[in-house]
């Protein structure tokens, strides 16, 4: 994890590389108060998040003050749909509590001039086509599905991404 990561739950290093992963991009940076709210609610969520009657070995990260990543290591079991639904419901609740967009999958993030910028996907495609955004610009892939993908494909230049 990076130096600007806040962690709740199981340490990231103890989560298996095949663990399920979801990354949510915030429409704006989190304030210190919002970070505290996220941590508080994440602790409660992780303590009761279960799949097939067993508590999920979960790790919750606030990354670069703009992203929330959830990792779920079910230790060989498949994660039940109800557990996945609970994580989505939790993120929708956080969105309401924080007053930020987290569930908008058409919102993408890039790094420009040492700042993370979020913009609609179609706008980014247009800026790439017009060369307003270089293909060497760092892109944050919100479509990863495992810890392994997170480690290899979450942060990468646009020209090496699915864009």
Where are the regions that the model predicts?
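Terminal interaction module
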Residues: 5, 103-163
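Short, flexible active-site-proximal loops enriched in glycine and acidic residues
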Residues: 57-59, 97-107
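Core structural elements
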Residues: 62-69
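Helix-adjacent hinge/juxtasegments
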Residues: 72-100
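Short, conserved beta-strand segments within well-ordered enzyme catalytic domains
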Residues: 23, 69-71
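Long, hydrophobic N-terminal alpha-helical segment
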Residues: 5-10, 17-61
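Short histidine/acidic/glycine/proline-rich micro-motifs that form metal-
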Residues: 29, 76-78, 111
């Amino acid at each position: 994890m990076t130096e600007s990561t806040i962690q709740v739950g199981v340490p990231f290093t103890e989560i298996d590389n095949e663990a399920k992963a979801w990354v949510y991009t915030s429409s704006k940076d989190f304030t210190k108060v919002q970070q505290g709210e996220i941590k508080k609610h994440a602790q409660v969520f992780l303590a009761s998040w279960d799949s097939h009657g067993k508590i999920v070995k979960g790790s919750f990260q606030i990354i670069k003050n703009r992203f929330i990543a959830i990792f779920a290591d079910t230790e060989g079991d498949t994660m039940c749909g109800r557990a996945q639904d609970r994580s989505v419901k939790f993120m929708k609740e956080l969105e309401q509590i924080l007053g930020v967009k987290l569930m908008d999958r058409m919102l993408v993030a890039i790094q420009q001039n040492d700042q993370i910028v979020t913009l609609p996907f179609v706008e980014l495609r247009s800026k790439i086509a017009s060369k307003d955004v270089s293909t060497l610009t760092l892109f944050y892939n919100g479509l990863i599905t495992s810890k392994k993908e997170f480690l290899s494909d979450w942060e990468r230049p646009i020209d090496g991404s699915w864009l």
